[in-house]
Amino acid sequence: MSNYPLHQACMENEFFKVQELLHSKPSLLLQKDQDGRIPLHWSVSFQAHEITSFLLSKMENVNLDDYPDDSGWTPFHIACSVGNLEVVKSLYDRPLKPDLNKITNQGVTCLHLAVGKKWFEVSQFLIENGASVRIKDKFNQIPLHRAASVGSLKLIELLCGLGKSAVNWQDKQGWTPLFHALAEGHGDAAVLLVEKYGAEYDLVDNKGAKAEDVALNEQVKKFFLNNV
């Protein structure tokens, strides 16, 4: 990273170095490194909050959507994955707001990322501001698949309640969120999907298996069948 001193300073949380570098060479603000990232990507990633605020103060007329890295991640994607709500808000509450539904190269939205990391407050903020719960990634999965996989009851309720998510959407292997909940051993999440949100447990995947057939173990399977 020696060719990218500002990026390095952001990673190492060297605030005065960042100020000094930008004062001497303002064009470094939007310089891309070998990963296609601008300095803001790294300050957000390394949670260098003071530096992030400083960089944003210099970027009032910059649309963050115009700066995806080589994987299609903008600084806002990173913020939602890291999960600090105040940082997410600081990147969103600007004259040029980021597109909440912008996807990465893998078809992943900020909501997919926040849900997958169990960041409830960030996920709620995104949905309240209009993020779609129905965008499918390259595996044909919507955010609810991820909520079910990590077994978060709160996120399932958020996505199905406030978000009005589809419940029986099948991914590329024919798995609905219910399959993922059972496969990861989250019997309580599976029961919630069926009992409160009407998930169909008789659907079969591409191999002809039902959700109960892919349960992590017999204990999870029995718990599920005894409660639906």
Curated annotation (Swiss-Prot):
One of its GO terms (biological process) is proteasome regulatory particle assembly. ANK repeats lie at residues 1-30, 35-64, 71-100, 106-135, 139-168, 173-203. It holds the Pfam family Ank_2. GO terms for molecular function: proteasome regulatory particle binding; protein folding chaperone. Keywords: ANK repeat, Chaperone, Repeat. InterPro entries: Ankyrin_rpt (IPR002110), Ankyrin_rpt-contain_sf (IPR036770). One of its GO terms (cellular component) is cytosol. Coiled coil: none annotated. Acts as a chaperone during the assembly of the 26S proteasome, specifically of the 19S regulatory complex (RC) and appears to have an overlapping role with RPN14. Present with 319 molecules/cell in log phase SD medium. PANTHER family: ANKYRIN REPEAT DOMAIN-CONTAINING PROTEIN 39, ANKYRIN REPEAT DOMAIN-CONTAINING PROTEIN 39-RELATED. Interacts with RPT3. This is Probable 26S proteasome regulatory subunit p28. It comes from Saccharomyces cerevisiae (strain ATCC 204508 / S288c) (Baker's yeast). The lineage of its organism: Eukaryota, Fungi, Dikarya, Ascomycota, Saccharomycotina. The gene is NAS6.
